[in-house]
């Protein structure tokens, strides 16, 4: 039990240190790349098209590298509960710098206690947005269908803007 508590505390401390480091680097914002509204909109539109082609109704949330909502799209008829989940998926992808599916795998295997960290989603549909240098620019979260379909829509959005992510 004590070992699980130590691991959980380690995860919480890691999340806090990551947040503090993000704040410390915020003053250098003008020097680092960022996610533009144009790119976020194009990403959401591509994810929207994929969902329409698949015959599913979803919410699409795109956040910047600080986890702040940058662009949001709700398809007509998408389930109400999926609104917040889409935003939490996008946030998780940024905060953990991994897809939400990968975060789920970590919570099962490597790091007991991560499931206790608030606002982290541990199933598919959230993907970090990275530029060609691997820098985190934001996250996309899709929710309203199965985790596999949500992830496919998020990936379609990301794939559509690869050339815009410098």
Name each model-derived stretch.
Residues 27-166:
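Flexible, solvent-exposed loop/hinge segments and secondary-structure transition points
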